[in-house]
Structures are given as C-alpha cells and as structure tokens.
C-alpha cells in the first residue's frame, strides 16, 4: 500500500510540473498526504468489494452444484414357485411295489415377505433434506469483512490537522447473508462569518467596526467581539474614527472646491449677460 501511495503521489507530481504555464499553486504537504490516504482507502474498499463478490459467486456456485441425494429404493426379490400339478394316484398292482413319494421342495417365500414387511414398517416420511450431507458454512466472507474493517482502523494515521477528518467505511454481514457497508458523512468546514456594526456619532458621522467570526473552534483567526479585550476594542474604534475623520475632511474639501467652482462659473455667466446687454444698447 505504501508503494501504491508513493506511485500515485509521484504520478500526480509528474503530471503537473512546476515549469508548466498551467501550474497555479503547489499543494500543501498535509493535503497531499490526506489525498494519498483517501486514494488508498478507496482502492482498499474496491479491492475488498471485489473479493466479496467473487467469494459470494463461488459460494452460490458450490451450493447450486450440490443436488439432493435420492434415497435408495429397496429391491425385493421374490422367487416364483412352480405350481404343483395333481398327479393321479398310482394303481396298485399285485406284482408292483408302491413308489416312494418325493420330498416336497421348500421355498423362501416367508423370508422374502418378512423383509418386505420390515421395509414397509420403517419411517418413510423423513424429509429429503435430512439425506443431504451436512453443509458447513464457509467463513471466507466473514474473514474478508473482518480483515477489511481491521485495515480501515490500522491504515488511517492520526492527522495533525484537526479541521478535517477522513470518513471510514465499515462493512457488516447480516443474518440473512447480505452485506451492508456504511460510510459516515463528513461536514465540510463552514466559511467564516463577517459582521459589521455601525454606530452614529454625535457629530453626524458613523463609526463602523468589522469583526470576523469563524465557526470552527480550532481556527487561529477566530475573532469574537465578546472575547475581545476592552483596550483592543477601543483602539479599533479610535482607528476607525480617525479614518472616518480623514474621509470627512476629503469630502468637505471637495464640497468647498465645488462651491468655489460654481461661484466662478456664475460670475462668468453674469459677466457674459452684462456684456450682451451692453452690446444690445
């Protein structure tokens, strides 16, 4: 990751050389560092999201490839027995001997029927899911999420600037298997508030005092009239009064100049009128 940050930083510096006419201003080192960290975090986030997508696809393919095992149906072998045919009784002759009857052939029908009854008495209502092998849930997705959250916490160094904080994305896996990532919103710094207070003076003028208040508590240029010392406040008012007096003097001088110019113009017009009257006489 350090190599990627150095590579991105070197690429940004080489793409905008100082000798270029389009180069306006060199960025602050802290800003460059924050941008490099943000680029690294975004690359990590995209990398882990790609890992999660690939792992979920592999898990789905593994589950889809496992088909339920069909239960084995017992095979019953029943040996057909020959139907005994009635044989006529032998005719006993005086000179013949009685034939000895052959022993009756034994069959195994009773054993086959007992096997059939045993199979039928078994519980055949067992669900097909019980015949499937026990599936052990894969912990690869949870491992990737844990590693991503750990890297989010360890790779973010404490910034020396308290004015800006980079957002950190946190991913969690829900009970239904879905993955949700949340990124907190960072409020940008507000522009400073400039207020001007004008107070009329007994001489007819106006004294205006301008104060700048920054909503950021860590800014060094924050100025609040409530926290300002009385000596500083009086010096600011005195300075504004001197400036106002100088502007008033300039205005009065301009008015006097305008009045003198107007008087001379009127005198010239009167002289022209008198000369025109003399010419008519």
From Swiss-Prot:
Its main location: virion. The keyword Membrane applies. It comes from Vaccinia virus (strain Western Reserve) (VACV). GO terms for cellular component: host cell endoplasmic reticulum-Golgi intermediate compartment membrane; membrane; virion component. Its phosphorylation state is regulated by the OPG054 kinase and the OPG106 phosphatase. Residues 24-33 have a biased composition (Basic and acidic residues). Keywords: Host membrane, Late protein, Membrane, Virion. This is 39kDa core protein OPG130. The keyword Transmembrane helix does not apply. Component of the virion core. Participates in virion assembly. Residues 154-175 have a biased composition (Low complexity). Interacts with OPG136 and its cleaved form.
């Amino acid at each position: 990751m350090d190599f990627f940050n150095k590579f991105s930083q070197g690429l940004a510096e080489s793409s905008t050389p100082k000798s270029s006419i389009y180069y306006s201003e060199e960025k602050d080192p802290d800003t460059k560092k924050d941008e490099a960290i943000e680029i690294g975090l975004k690359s990590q986030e995209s990398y882990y999201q790609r890992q999660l997508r690939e792992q979920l696809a592999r898990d789905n393919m593994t589950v889809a490839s496992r088909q339920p095992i069909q239960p084995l149906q017992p095979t019953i072998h029943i040996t057909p027995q020959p139907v005994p045919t009635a044989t006529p009784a032998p005719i006993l002759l005086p000179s013949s001997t009685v034939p000895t009857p052959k022993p009756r052939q034994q069959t195994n029908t009773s054993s086959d029927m007992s096997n059939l009854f045993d199979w039928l008495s078994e519980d055949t209502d067992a669900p097909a899911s019980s015949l499937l092998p026990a599936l052990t849930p894969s912990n690869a997705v949870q491992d990737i999420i844990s590693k991503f959250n750990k890297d989010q916490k360890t790779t973010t160094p404490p910034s020396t600037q308290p004015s800006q904080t980079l957002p950190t994305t946190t991913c969690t896996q829900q009970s239904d298997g879905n993955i949700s990532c949340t990124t907190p919103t960072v409020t940008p710094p507000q522009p400073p508030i400039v207020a001007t207070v004008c107070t009329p003076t007994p001489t007819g003028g106006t004294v205006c005092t301008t104060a700048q208040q920054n909503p950021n508590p860590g800014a060094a240029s924050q100025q609040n009239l409530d926290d300002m010392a009385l000596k500083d406040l009086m010096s600011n008012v005195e300075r504004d009064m001197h400036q106002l007096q100088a502007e008033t003097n300039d205005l009065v001088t301009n008015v006097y100049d305008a009045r003198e110019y107007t008087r001379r113009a009127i005198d010239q017009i009167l002289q022209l009128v008198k000369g025109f009257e003399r010419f008519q006489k």
